[in-house]
């Protein structure tokens, strides 16, 4: 599908900020190119990947509004991961056990969420209103997205959680300013890495807390499919068009 999109349709930037500023390096895409950027989507990758993982699907997302969106795909730091025998790889936090309860390093996850807060702060400083910023993530990145968005101090546009789980549901201190934030959860019914039961558990937890959640299930494994990309585009168009 990428080949059908002219190269000039989107602008790609790679940003590397000073480490002492505690801003994560990231790949950026402004789409469609030439339109004034009025919204941002911060999209976190999964375990072992990097910010380039989801950047290629940007031209496939059909957005129905007449302004540009800045997609920001940060790179996770490389750390030892217990479930992979301590192998050092890009990860937002350590996973200690792959059982149904997902024993993870909560402090590392919260630290990653604080890095996302700084990316949000930077987008606001670039002129994007907080309620035009979506926080998204796949797998590990989705778990961080829940924590980052629900604890942020200003109202955000939404949370997009793909093939993930709500790792900090029992410890999170939700900022009431984002108590009604819209949430999109997408999950593969054949996912062997993050079973769909964890996606449904996130759904029930958030609904019990009063959140507006849209849930989609697809007959795929731990991946994103074309129908999911279409649903993502529709949801983003509604959320950013209404916010």
Annotated model-derived regions:
Residues 185-187, 191:
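Short beta-strand/loop motif that positions the catalytic acidic residue
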Residues 2-41, 52, 201-204, 213, ...:
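A domain-start/cap signature at the N-terminus of enzymes
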Residues 197-243:
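C-terminal catalytic histidine-bearing segment of alpha/beta-hydrolase fold enzymes
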Residues 20-131:
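Serine-hydrolase catalytic machinery in alpha/beta-hydrolase-like enzymes
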Residues 63-66, 175-180:
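Short, conserved loop/helix-junction motifs that constitute active-site signature segments
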Residues 178-183, 211:
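Short, proline-enriched alpha-helix->beta-strand connector loops that line the catalytic pocket
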Residues 45-47, 133-138, 188:
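Conserved alpha/beta-hydrolase "nucleophile elbow" surrounding the catalytic nucleophile
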Residues 124, 131-178:
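Primarily recognizes the serine-hydrolase "nucleophile elbow" in alpha/beta-hydrolase
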């Amino acid at each position: 599908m990428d080949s059908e999109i002219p190269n000039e349709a989107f602008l790609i930037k790679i940003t590397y900020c000073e480490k002492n500023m505690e801003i994560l390096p990231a790949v950026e895409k402004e789409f469609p190119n030439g339109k004034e950027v009025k919204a941002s989507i911060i999209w976190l990758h999964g375990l072992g990947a990097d910010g380039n993982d989801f950047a290629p699907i940007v031209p496939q997302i059909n957005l129905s509004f007449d302004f540009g969106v800045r997609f920001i795909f940060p790179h996770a730091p490389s750390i030892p991961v217990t479930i992979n025998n301590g192998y050092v790889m890009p990860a937002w936090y350590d996973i200690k056990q792959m059982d149904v309860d997902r024993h993870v390093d909560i402090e590392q996850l919260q630290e990653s969420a604080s890095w996302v807060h700084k990316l949000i702060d930077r987008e606001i400083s670039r002129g994007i209103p907080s309620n035009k910023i979506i926080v998204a993530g796949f797998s590990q990145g989705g778990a961080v997205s829940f924590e980052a968005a629900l604890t942020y101090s200003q109202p955000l546009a939404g949370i997009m959680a793909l093939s993930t789980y709500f790792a900090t549901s029992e410890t999170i201190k939700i900022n009431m300013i984002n108590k009604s934030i819209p949430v999109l959860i997408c999950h593969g019914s054949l996912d062997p890495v993050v079973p769909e039961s964890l996606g449904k558990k996130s759904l029930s937890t958030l609904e019990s807390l009063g959140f507006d959640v849209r849930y989609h299930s697809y007959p795929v494994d731990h991946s994103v499919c074309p129908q999911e990309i279409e649903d993502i585009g529709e949801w983003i168009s509604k959320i950013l068009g209404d916010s």
